[in-house]
Amino acid sequence: TSAPASLRDRLRRFLPPVPAPAPAPVSKDERARLDRLIAERTASHALARPDLTRGDALFTTHCASCHQVNGRGSLLGPQLDGIGARGVARLSEDILDPNRNVDAHFYLTTLKLRDGTTTAGFIRDESRATLLLVDTAGREHRLEKDKIAGRDTLAMSLMPATFENLLTKEQFDDLLGWLLSQRTQ
C-alpha cells in the first residue's frame, strides 16, 4: 500500500525529485529521416574542405551564447573543450538531432514559487533543503525548497533542432571542421 497523500505531500520536499519523463519519441519516419541526414552530412564532410575561420565565426554566432570552448562562450549548455574527439558522426548527430542524447543536467526546470512567481533554469545542485538553479542568463539562484510550490521539468534540449535549415551544407562543414579541430591539448 502507499502512504496517504497528505503524508506524501509533507515528505516530498525531503525526497529527491522524480526523474523527468523522457521526451516524446519521434516517429519512425522522422527518426529514419534524421538518421539519413546525419549519415549524409557525415559522408559529405569527408569530401569537404572546411574553412576553420568561418567555422569559428559560426560558433561565435550560433553556439557561444550557450557553449564554451577554451574559455570562450557561456556555460549555459555543455562545455565543449575537447569536443573534436567525438568525431564527425557524433558531432553531426549532436548538431542535427540535439534531443537524441540530452544529459539530465541540461533539462530545463520551471519552478513555481509560493509567492506566485516563477523561475526557470537548470538544476545544478540539490540538497534536502535547497536547490541551486542556474537561469537561462547564467545567473545562480539558491532557493529554499520550502518556498517552492511546484516544479516542471522538460526532458529536452534547449538547443534548436533547426541547424539543418539554419546552416547551408558549406556552413555546416565549416562549423563541424572547426569543432573537430578543438581537441584537448
Question: Which ranges hold each PLM region?
Answer:
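Post-cleavage N-terminal segment of exported redox proteins
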Residues: 1-50, 61, 69-72, 178-185
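Primarily the internal scaffold of c-type cytochrome electron-transfer domains
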Residues: 41, 45-46, 50, 74-106, ...
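Sequence/structural segment immediately N-terminal to covalent heme-attachment motifs in c-type
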Residues: 48-69, 84-87, 175
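Periplasmic/extracellular electron-transfer cofactor-ligation site
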Residues: 57-79, 101-104, 117-119, 125-132, ...
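A short beta-strand micro-motif
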Residues: 109-115
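Structured surface patches comprising rigid loops and adjacent beta-strands/short helices at the edges
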Residues: 138-158, 162
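Long, low-complexity intrinsically disordered regions
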Residues: 162-185
